């Protein structure tokens, strides 16, 4: 287990879990709820465009079945093709947070994606929307390409995190942008959350071993054969990677180094 003092701090909030879970693509509502529970995540992200205007009038929506005293809602602006659309979505997201009893929740996962084929985030639109939302008091978590300079610009604007993609969203290709992600982690003064492209627990572990502060997953869990079980596996993968990062990797050596040196044995004789 990680140290209780080793919390993920985003804005003015602290979280025990470094795994965030999305809510799309699940085969059933029950599967989504079970996966969230088994992941032990603290943050759940929800696409605003998929939700009704008023949750109180929707007894079917699974968000009404989650315990929002234990979970923190992260509305996301998925589907926004322009900065203006993302800004509107962000304000709707705050209204949703209020409906689940989180009036002080101004978090938003900012996604501006104008490319319908490859679903790569729009850096210009993201910068524009982030600047406006920060001025309005939002805690902005921007989804970006693994671009070290863009990450720095967003941090300078006041973003609470940066969220570089590991590989294209929903692809399960893993950490394809390893070199740039390392640079982002090295340069960042805000938490770095790896978002999109991770397909296995070992890839989540690798991301955390690099020094990432957290991982956000959706498709890898929702589209697995057993989402609840995969959610548990991802939880353990993130925990293992974080522990390994804190413990510190052994130094790589060119030559072999015996684990039972002869000089130590001679002292016992």
Swiss-Prot record:
- Please classify the protein's predominant subcellular localization into one broad category: plastid
Catalysed reaction(s) here are: [ThiS sulfur-carrier protein]-C-terminal-Gly-aminoethanethioate + 2-iminoacetate + 1-deoxy-D-xylulose 5-phosphate = [ThiS sulfur-carrier protein]-C-terminal Gly-Gly + 2-[(2R,5Z)-2-carboxy-4-methylthiazol-5(2H)-ylidene]ethyl phosphate + 2 H2O + H(+)
Q: Report one GO cellular component.
A: chloroplast
**Which of this chain's residues are annotated to bind 1-deoxy-D-xylulose 5-phosphate?**
170, 196-197, 218-219
Gene3D superfamilies named among the record's database cross-references: Aldolase class I
Q: In which pathway does it act?
A: Cofactor biosynthesis; thiamine diphosphate biosynthesis
Q: Which UniProt keywords apply?
A: Chloroplast, Plastid, Schiff base, Thiamine biosynthesis, Transferase
Gene Ontology biological-process annotations:
thiamine diphosphate biosynthetic process
Name where it's found. Answer: Plastid, Chloroplast
Give the similarity note: Belongs to the ThiG family.
Q: How does it assemble?
A: Homotetramer. Forms heterodimers with either ThiH or ThiS.
Query: What protein is this chain from?
Result: Thiazole synthase
Gene this chain is encoded by: thiG
């Amino acid at each position: 287990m990680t140290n209780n003092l080793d919390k993920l701090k985003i804005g003015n909030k602290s979280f025990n879990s470094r795994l965030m879970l999305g809510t799309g693509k699940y085969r059933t509502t029950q599967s989504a709820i079970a996966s969230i529970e088994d992941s032990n995540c603290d943050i759940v992200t929800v696409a605003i465009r998929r939700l009704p205007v008023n949750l109180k009038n929707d007894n079917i929506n699974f968000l009404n079945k989650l315990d929002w005293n234990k979970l923190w809602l992260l509305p996301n602006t998925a589907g926004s093709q322009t900065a203006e659309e993302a800004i509107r979505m962000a304000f709707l997201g705050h209204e949703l947070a209020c409906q689940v009893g989180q009036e002080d929740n101004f978090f938003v996962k900012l996604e501006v994606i104008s490319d319908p084929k490859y679903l790569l985030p729009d850096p210009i639109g993201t910068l524009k929307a982030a600047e406006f939302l920060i001025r309005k008091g939002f805690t902005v978590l921007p989804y970006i390409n693994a671009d070290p300079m863009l990450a720095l610009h967003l941090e300078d604007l006041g973003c609470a995190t940066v969220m570089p993609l590991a590989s294209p969203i929903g692809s399960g290709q893993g950490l394809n942008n390893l070199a740039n992600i390392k640079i982002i982690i090295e340069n960042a003064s805000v938490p770095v959350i790896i978002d999109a492209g991770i397909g296995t627990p070992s890839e989540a572990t690798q991301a955390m071993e690099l020094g990432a502060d957290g991982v956000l997953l959706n498709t890898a869990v929702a589209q697995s054969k057993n989402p609840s079980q995969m959610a548990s596996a991802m939880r353990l993968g993130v925990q293992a990677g974080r522990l390994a990062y804190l413990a510190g990797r052994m130094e790589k050596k060119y030559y072999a180094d015996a684990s039972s040196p002869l000089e130590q044995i001679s002292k016992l004789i």
